UniProtKB/Swiss-Prot annotation:
Keywords: Chloroplast, Plastid, Ribonucleoprotein, Ribosomal protein. It comes from Vitis vinifera (Grape). It comes from the Eukaryota. Belongs to the universal ribosomal protein uS15 family. This is Small ribosomal subunit protein uS15c. It is found in: Plastid, Chloroplast. One of its GO terms (molecular function) is structural constituent of ribosome. Transmembrane segments: none annotated. CDD domains: Ribosomal_S15p_S13e (cd00353). SMART domains: Ribosomal_S15.
Length: 88
């Protein structure tokens, strides 16, 4: 499974499961699950709200990581297949 592979890669670098990379990875998994759920259940407004909240949390973590360590940020978005956000 991709999650186990990614966890092993991160745990080799750091033993901290609360790292920004791991949190972004778990939020990305939740986002993908909610997106597939919402494709079937279009009128599930509570799930839509939850998805927007998780997207905001992930965005804040990614912007923090981009400010602190640009190299780790680039590696992470490359591994997860996330587009780079536009800076305001």
């Amino acid at each position: 499974m991709v999650k186990n592979l990614f966890i092993s890669v991160i745990s080799q670098k750091e033993a901290n499961r609360g790292s920004v990379e791991f949190q972004v990875f778990s939020f990305t998994n939740k986002i993908r699950r909610l997106t597939s759920h919402l494709e079937l259940h279009r009128k599930d407004y509570l799930s839509q709200r939850g998805l927007r909240k998780i997207l905001g949390k992930r965005q804040r973590l990614l912007s923090y990581l981009a400010k602190k360590n640009r190299v780790r940020y680039k590696e992470l978005i490359g591994q997860l297949g996330i587009r780079e956000t536009k800076i305001r």
